[in-house]
């Protein structure tokens, strides 16, 4: 149970998490987070604004919500009397405060709910105020930030309170349609109609540490099911494990996290190509192809591509990119560990990166399912690609997988459909896409992240319709014939450059990437920049048309023309 911020005049407060007696000034200095157990006290709207926005930047929006008592509700008190008491007790007109502000210099419209006001319940006035905030964000083309704290719909307004879920959601939909970013911050508690609408249908969902969120509250669930609930049920950490939120952030880091997201959303950094020419060397297709055409045996290349010392996607994100904020979850119940992705910065430009994650040790590999994505992993990648399209961010994918997860569970959850939807979406994504095969490119699991404007490949990576072992077992049939199958499959970077599947080969430090990971990661950084920069200048319609034409040439007619040209 989360503790409540102490009332004015109290010198001491008892933590609701660990029962420690805390000096109030010390608690305030620690942002109302218990220094003993880390429990986060609830904050009122003014305190939350003071924590999140730049000092002096907040300007309240005009309160144009009319006084409403739509159904003349009376319980032990008439509804208007409850409103009067809530206003007197909080000093607020309603359960939400809306205005314009900046966060680390990035402009936004922000709406902060206050649980003290009738449990932060969603009624007609609250719905109207948040809708007006979204409309202001749309008019100004600045991100909308919503900080939620609510028990759900306001019962005293009957079914009209239910309608606010749709009213605010369609305002969020208008932001999506126009490419205006939206971010929600879930604080404790967020339930019912708020959880099932604007708290979770924004572009990015952040949960403050320990915050609880759900459609039905725990008491209702216990009553209906007659079962005890697991420890940590509906907490932020539970939601993260189950793919419902992008991030769980402690209060002291919340402002910085929000600032990073808003900067990426607004693209408020120096564009690549202006002041970064030294990191964008021209690409000589013939020389890169020639470099990839080494004499190493195909089977030896397969073994190098699988070496556990090769840089992983998280290694690249730490070294080849300037910053990275990981975004989690497919929003449908899972967060696949074999796929990682999020917002990164590359030479001053916000980009979205998504890739397969393996690991360097047996434990890492097992925890990441050896880089074999489940349907949840593919759907996470799909969600992030669509986010990039809405925010106008280029996409970089890093491919290193033996293939998609072939398990029974994956088939039950729609593996084929998940891969198919990724391929379909990437063919028409209205933003530049650069794919890099960094290790293994295994079958449809690889292609699900490799439908791109430019496909690059590390010198000792492989890309194939099937593993050599699988091919040998089916066609020879003898798994020991895997080396022969590797040669026959034409899966090396040199082979794929000649076939036109790969646009350029990224040289590896001798003898291979795992001998000098920093050099390999720097080479990938330079190659991605070299291929991404020209794409940023291509109009969207032309970009998509060229991407489709690129893959159309792999039809029989296109391959026949290539053979004739040779």
From Swiss-Prot:
Coiled-coil intervals: none
Q: Where is the CoA carboxyltransferase C-terminal domain?
A: 282-534
One GO cellular component from the entry?
A: acetyl-CoA carboxylase complex
GO biological processes = fatty acid biosynthetic process; malonyl-CoA biosynthetic process
- Chain residues that bind Zn(2+): 15, 18, 34, 37
The record, for Pfam families, names: ACCA, Carboxyl_trans, Zn_ribbon_ACC
Judging by the UniProt lineage, the source's domain of life is Bacteria
* Region annotation (Disordered) ranges: 268-295
The record ties this protein, via SUPFAM superfamilies, to:
ClpP/crotonase (SSF52096)
Task: Look up the record and name the cofactor or cofactors this protein needs.
Answer: Zn(2+)
Provide the residue span(s) of the region labelled Acetyl-coenzyme A carboxylase carboxyl transferase subunit beta: 1-243
Q: Which residues form the CoA carboxyltransferase N-terminal domain?
A: 11-280
UniProt EC number = 2.1.3.15
- Co-factor binding details: Binds 1 zinc ion per subunit.
Is-annotated flag, keyword Zinc-finger? yes
Record bears the keyword Ribonucleoprotein: no
Q: Where is this region: Carboxyltransferase?
A: 11-534
Keywords, alphabetical: ATP-binding, Cytoplasm, Fatty acid biosynthesis, Fatty acid metabolism, Lipid biosynthesis, Lipid metabolism, Metal-binding, Nucleotide-binding, Transferase, Zinc, Zinc-finger
Q: In which pathway does it act?
A: Lipid metabolism; malonyl-CoA biosynthesis; malonyl-CoA from acetyl-CoA: step 1/1
Q: Which GO terms describe its molecular function?
A: acetyl-CoA carboxylase activity; ATP binding; carboxyl- or carbamoyltransferase activity; zinc ion binding
Complex and partners: Acetyl-CoA carboxylase is a heterotetramer composed of biotin carboxyl carrier protein (AccB), biotin carboxylase (AccC) and two subunits of ACCase subunit beta/alpha.
State the family it belongs to: In the N-terminal section; belongs to the AccD/PCCB family.
Name assigned to this protein:
Acetyl-coenzyme A carboxylase carboxyl transferase subunits beta/alpha
UniProt gene name: accD
């Amino acid at each position: 149970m989360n503790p409540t911020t102490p009332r004015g005049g109290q010198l001491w407060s008892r933590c609701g998490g660990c029962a420690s007696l805390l000096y109030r000034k010390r608690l305030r200095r620690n942002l109302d987070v218990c220094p003993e157990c880390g429990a986060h006290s609830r904050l009122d709207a003014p305190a939350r604004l003071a924590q999140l926005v730049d000092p002096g930047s907040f300007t309240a929006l005009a309160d144009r919500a009319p006084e409403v008592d739509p159904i003349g509700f009376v319980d032990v008190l008439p509804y208007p009397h409850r409103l009067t008491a809530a206003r007197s007790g909080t000093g607020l007109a309603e359960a939400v405060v809306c205005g314009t502000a900046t966060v680390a210099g990035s402009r936004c419209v922000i709406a902060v709910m206050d649980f003290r006001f009738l449990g932060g319940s969603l009624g007609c006035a609250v719905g109207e105020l948040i809708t007006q905030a979204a409309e202001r964000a749309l008019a100004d083309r600045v991100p909308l930030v919503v900080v939620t704290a609510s028990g759900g719909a306001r019962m005293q307004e009957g079914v009209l309170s239910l309608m606010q879920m749709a009213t605010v959601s369609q305002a969020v939909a208008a932001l999506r349609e126009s490419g205006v970013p939206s971010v929600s911050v879930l604080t404790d508690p967020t339930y019912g109609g708020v959880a099932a609408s604007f708290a979770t249908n924004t572009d990015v969902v952040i949960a403050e540490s320990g915050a609880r969120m759900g459609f039905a509250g725990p008491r209702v669930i216990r009553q209906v099911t007659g079962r005890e609930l697991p420890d940590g049920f509906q907490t932020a950490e539970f939601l993260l494990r189950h793919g419902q939120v992008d991030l769980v952030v402690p209060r002291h880091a919340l402002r910085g996290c929000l600032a990073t997201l808003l900067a990426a959303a607004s693209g408020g950094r120096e564009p690549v190509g202006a002041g970064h020419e030294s990191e964008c060397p021209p690409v000589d297709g013939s020389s890169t192809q020639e470099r990839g055409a080494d004499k190493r045996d195909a089977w030896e290349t397969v073994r190098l591509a699988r070496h556990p010392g090769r840089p992983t996607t998280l290694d690249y994100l730490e070294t080849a990119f300037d910053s990275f904020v990981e975004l989690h979850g497919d929003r449908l119940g899972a967060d696949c560990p074999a796929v990682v992705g999020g917002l990164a910065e590359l030479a001053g430009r916000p980009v979205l990166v998504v890739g397969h994650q393996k690991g360097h040790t047996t434990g890492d590999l097992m925890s990441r399912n050896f880089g074999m994505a489940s349907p949840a992993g593919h759907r996470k990648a799909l969600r992030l690609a669509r986010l990039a399209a809405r925010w106008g961010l280029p996409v970089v994918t890093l491919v290193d997988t033996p293939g998609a997860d072939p398990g029974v569970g994956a088939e039950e959850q729609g593996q084929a459909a998940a891969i198919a939807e990724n391929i379909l979406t990437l063919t028409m994504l209205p933003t530049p896409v650069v794919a890099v095969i960094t290790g293994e490119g295994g079958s449809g699991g690889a292609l699900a992240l490799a439908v791109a404007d430019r496909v690059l490949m590390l010198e000792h990576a492989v890309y194939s319709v099937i593993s050599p072992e699988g091919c040998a077992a089916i066609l020879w049939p003898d798994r020991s014939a895997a080396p022969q199958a590797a040669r026959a499959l034409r899966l090396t970077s040199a082979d794929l450059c000649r076939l036109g599947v790969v646009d350029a080969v990224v040289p590896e430090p001798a003898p291979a990437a795992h001998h000098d990971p920093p050099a390999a990661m720097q080479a990938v950084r330079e190659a991605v920049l070299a291929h991404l920069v020209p794409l940023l200048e291509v109009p969207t319609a032309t970009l998509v048309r060229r991407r489709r034409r690129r893959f159309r040439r792999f039809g029989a007619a296109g391959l026949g023309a290539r053979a004739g040209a040779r």
